[in-house]
Amino acid sequence: MPGPAAGSRARVYAEVNSLRSREYWDYEAHVPSWGNQDDYQLVRKLGRGKYSEVFEAINITNNERVVVKILKPVKKKKIKREVKILENLRGGTNIIKLIDTVKDPVSKTPALVFEYINNTDFKQLYQILTDFDIRFYMYELLKALDYCHSKGIMHRDVKPHNVMIDHQQKKLRLIDWGLAEFYHPAQEYNVRVASRYFKGPELLVDYQMYDYSLDMWSLGCMLASMIFRKEPFFHGQDNYDQLVRIAKVLGTDELYGYLKKYHIDLDPHFNDILGQHSRKRWENFIHSENRHLVSPEALDLLDKLLRYDHQQRLTAKEAMEHPYFYPVVKEQSQPCAENTVLSSGLTAAR
C-alpha cells in the first residue's frame, strides 16, 4: 500500500489567514447583499465560461460602462467563495474591481458587476508585444499575484484568458476569481483546478497540499509562451499527456526526484507514457522569430519559475526583484512614469 504523501507549506504568507478573524476567510458563513439587476442594461455578450456568461453593460443610474458576469446554476458555496474573495481583494493592485452583486428580479439568478476593461484578445496581442511590453505586463501581473497571496488567497486559474490587458492604456487586470481559494497550511485542496496547459506538476501528480506557488507555475507558462512565441508552451492532449510534455522539457529524472521528496506515488498509467527524457536547455527554444524577445535574464527567470518542486519556485515578490524587471522598475521609479511607459521602448528604460 502506498504511504501518505509528505507535507508541505507555503514559503511566504503561510499564516495570513490564521492571523485574521474567522469572518475574513470563512466564506460559507458569508451572506452577500444582492442588489437589483435592473440598474444594469446588457449591451452585448463578451463571452461564456463553464460557470458563467459575461456581458458588457451600462449602469443606467450613472451611464458607466461595466461588465456583468451572470452565474450559471452552481453550488451556493462556490458563489459565496468568489464574492468573499472579490470583496477581500477590492482595491488591490491590478485586481479586477467588484462594483456590485445583483440578482435578476424574476429568475433570482445571481450576477457580479465589474469595472470594464477594453481588452485586446491575447492571441492577437501576444503577436505584437515587444521585449519591454512582456517585461512590463509580467511585472504588472506579479503585482496582482503578490497582492492576493499577501491576502491569503491563491488564484488557481492564472492563464491569458484571465488576464485582461488594455494595451492603449497599458492597464492589466487579473480576472475570474471563481476557482480562487483561501490558503491554510496543511490543508489538502482539490487538484481539479486551473486550465490544462497551465496546471502545475503538483496538480498532475495529484499532490493536494499545494499553495500559492501553483500560481507561479502558471505565470511561468505564460512567460514561456510570450518570449518563445509558442502558445501554449506545454501543449498536452489531456491531463496525463500534459505531464509528459512537461517532462520532455524539465526531464524525467528531475520529476522522479520531486516525487521522491514529497513521497508521491505516480498513477500507474504514467508507466506506459512517460518514457525517459533528459532536461532541455531553454536556449533550445530560441529561433529567428522569437530571438528579439529572449535574453539571458528572461531565461534565468523562467528557469526559476518552471520548477517541478513548488517550494523551489520564486515567490511573486522574489520574481519582481529579478534583473529581468530592472528596466520596468527603473521606468516606474521615474517621475511622470505614466507618460514614459507609452514609449514601450527598452532603450528608454536603460
UniProtKB/Swiss-Prot annotation:
It comes from the Eukaryota. Highly expressed in brain, testis and mature epididymal spermatozoa. Weakly expressed in kidney, liver, lung, spleen and thymus (at protein level). ATP binds at residues 46-54, 69. The active site is at 157 (proton acceptor). One of its GO terms (molecular function) is protein serine/threonine kinase activity. Gene3D superfamilies: Phosphorylase Kinase, domain 1, Transferase(Phosphotransferase) domain 1. Heterotetramer composed of two catalytic subunits (alpha chain and/or alpha' chain) and two regulatory subunits (beta chains). The tetramer can exist as a combination of 2 alpha/2 beta, 2 alpha'/2 beta or 1 alpha/1 alpha'/2 beta subunits. Also part of a CK2-SPT16-SSRP1 complex composed of SSRP1, SUPT16H, CSNK2A1, CSNK2A2 and CSNK2B, which forms following UV irradiation. Interacts with RNPS1. Interacts with CSNK2A2IP (via C-terminus). Interacts with SIRT6; preventing CSNK2A2 localization to the nucleus. Interacts with HIRIP3. This is Casein kinase II subunit alpha'.
